[in-house]
């Protein structure tokens, strides 16, 4: 595992800083078979971090497309609940398909929403700074946990 950008740059460590909350305490190491480990912050902790810093903020998700076997969801992050649609600080889409997996296969809509939310929060600075310097991020990691 390479050096964390969070540890290498004081500016990155100060991004969205909340006194008394250290996101690294909630991060975990994950890896796919045959790949190097990466540090990852689950979406539930990204949401917690966002709520601690922005108690009047909001996260809005919209179903863009939904069929029997596929869902596309958009998520937008706002610093204040009164912000207009175009004033989001993070925005992302995610697509998921129904699978044969007995635990998560039918939860493709929920997984798409979680992925879109995680990516939108990362876009707003809640999680991306934990990426290892020089490593590519796997977009499917937003579903972990």
Which residues does each predicted region cover?
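Polyanion-binding surfaces on beta-sheet-dominated domains and ring/shell assemblies
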Residues: 1-145
């Amino acid at each position: 595992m390479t050096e964390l950008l969070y540890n290498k740059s004081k500016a990155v460590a100060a991004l969205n800083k909340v006194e008394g909350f250290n996101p690294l305490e909630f991060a975990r190491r994950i890896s796919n078979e045959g790949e190097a480990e990466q540090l990852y912050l689950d979406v539930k902790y990204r949401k917690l971090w966002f709520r601690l810093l922005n108690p009047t903020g909001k996260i809005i998700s919209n179903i863009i497309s939904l069929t029997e076997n596929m869902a596309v969801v958009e998520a937008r992050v706002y610093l204040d609940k009164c912000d207009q649609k175009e004033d989001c600080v993070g925005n992302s889409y995610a697509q998921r398909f129904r699978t044969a997996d007995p635990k998560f296969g039918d939860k493709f809509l929920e997984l798409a929403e979680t992925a879109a939310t995680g990516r939108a929060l990362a876009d707003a600075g809640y999680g991306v700074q934990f990426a290892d310097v020089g490593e590519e991020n796997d977009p499917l990691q937003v579903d972990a946990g």
